[in-house]
Structures are given as structure tokens and as C-alpha cells.
Amino acid sequence: MSALLEVEDLEVSFGRTGAVRGASLKVERGETLCVVGESGCGKSVTSLAVMNLLARGARRTATRMSFEGQDLLRLSDAGMSKLRGNDMAMIFQEPMTSLNPAYTVGSQMTEVLRRHKGASQRVATDRAADLLARVGITAPGLRLGQFPH
């Protein structure tokens, strides 16, 4: 059985600036990996590279990058989109950039539920409101219609 996630010799650069050089990791099923390092050392860039969410113009290479045996280096954008949010996710460091200010909180939360869980708009909206209430956000129905800022 292959590892859940395997990355071998990851290199990421932005133009001529190297951001990650030779990163390798292996995560087996049931394991948790904690990546610790100084600010700017490449922790987030490594995660973004695995998720194929790097900014346009970034260059990503690796000897091997697989998730559940699937070659992430050869997977199409549509294939990566199916994995992200359902099978593979990232908790972003900066909460102010986790939600896009151009879209309502509700549209961003329900998109995930509709795309990955096949929920109807009504079911997704009810679930999103429930999730907001569970974490202590007041007036969740109202908040779903607001823009993050």
C-alpha cells in the first residue's frame, strides 16, 4: 500500500528566486505531519505546491508527488479540483485572506458543499448556517449574505 502523501525533492521558484529547495515528506494513513519553521522558510509554499495553488508564474518541480497513489504532477486542473476540499485540504495561516472579499461568506461556503458533497443550494445553505452557529458566530443566516472584511 502506498503512502497517503509522498513528496520527493520538491523545488519551487518565483522567477529566479528559489523558495523551496529539495523538500521531501511522506505521510502514511492515520499520521499527522506538522511542518515547523521560521517565517518565510517555505512552509506555506510547500503546501500550496502540493495543492497546486501556487501563484501564476511560480515554477514547481519534484521527482515525485503523489496523493493516494495519484501522480499530482500529471493530474489535470479538473482532477486537482476534485481532490481539493474533499480529500485534501489546507488550513491557511492568514485568516484575513482565507475568504475572498469579492464574494459573500455564504457563496464561498456553499460552493464547497455543492461541489464536493453534491448538496442542493438549500441543503448547502442550511449546513453552512449550522457550521457558523457551531463556532459561535451570531446571526449565521445574516452572516451568510455578508462579505468578509
Where do the PLM segments sit?
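ABC transporter nucleotide-binding domains
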Residues: 1-149
